[in-house]
């Protein structure tokens, strides 16, 4: 009976993933193009030593964002993960501009975007990618799970998606979503509905590292034993007052060497 139950859960998770994909994605999105590049890159890099870059909130400052992309490129990353708010209103014109910068500066790097609260969901689904997605590699022992919480809550379908994806274990599992959970340290512009369920799930599954964005600073915390980072300094106006962390333009470079994970915050001058 236990084996049947486990199989049933796997099937349910697979159906859920397909459902999210069919609802949230169309052909020829940035996600699809990047996934093809990533699959090729996974075969090229050494499982013993590879790097990826995380950044977020690039709206309203193309000059800084271009510097951010150029800096990220120098690390020869396996992929770049953008934490959302690539635009102010998510229009097609803004999306054209964003894609032109990405394609012009890092055309060869797989580029994945977590949906933010400034995005237009219709445009995002048609041109950027799904609202929930998972990057997975058995060869690299790597799993990156991105979940939509741009409405300041983690809804039941997203929580179910997250739990399904966490059930498939990898040596290093990362979780990303745009808005940070409310904690004693992070108590402004954060979300509460579903936050306890989120942090419990991450702790119970021994997630390697959680990435959040939205608040335009760099900050670190440990939440129920899970290392957590806010990285939202890719161009949007910095959150100078009232927030924990360092209000600087920056990227986070993640290095996985012999299965051990290290991170480095690298500043960018305006």
Listing of model-derived features with the role each one plays in the protein:
Residues 57, 84-85, 116-117, 178, ...:
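Active-site glycine-centered loops adjacent to acidic/histidine catalytic or metal-binding residues
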């Amino acid at each position: 009976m236990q084996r049947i139950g486990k199989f049933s859960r796997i099937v349910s998770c697979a159906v859920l993933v397909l459902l999210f994909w069919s609802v949230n994605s169309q052909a020829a999105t940035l996600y699809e193009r990047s996934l093809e590049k990533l699959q090729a890159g996974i075969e090229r890099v050494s499982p013993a030593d590879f790097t990826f870059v995380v950044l977020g909130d690039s709206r309203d400052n193309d000059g800084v964002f271009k510097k951010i992309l150029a800096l990220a490129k120098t690390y020869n990353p396996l992929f770049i993960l953008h934490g959302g708010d690539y635009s102010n209103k998510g229009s097609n014109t803004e999306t054209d501009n964003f894609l032109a910068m990405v394609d012009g500066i890092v055309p060869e790097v797989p580029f994945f975007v977590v949906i933010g609260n400034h995005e237009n969901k219709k445009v995002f689904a048609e041109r950027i990618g799904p609202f929930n997605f998972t990057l997975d590699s058995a060869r690299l022992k790597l799993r990156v799970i991105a979940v939509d919480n741009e409405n300041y809550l983690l809804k039941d379908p997203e929580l179910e998606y997250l739990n399904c994806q966490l059930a498939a274990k990898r040596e290093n599992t990362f979780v990303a979503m745009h808005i940070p959970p409310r904690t004693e340290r992070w108590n402004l512009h954060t979300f509460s509905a579903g936050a306890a369920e989120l942090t419990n799930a991450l702790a119970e599954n021994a997630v390697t590292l959680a990435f959040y964005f939205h608040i335009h600073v760099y900050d670190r915390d440990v939440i129920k034993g899970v290392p957590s980072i806010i990285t939202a300094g890719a161009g949007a106006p910095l959150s100078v007052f009232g927030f924990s962390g360092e209000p600087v333009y920056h990227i986070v470079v993640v290095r996985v060497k012999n299965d051990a994970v290290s991170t480095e915050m690298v500043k960018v001058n305006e």
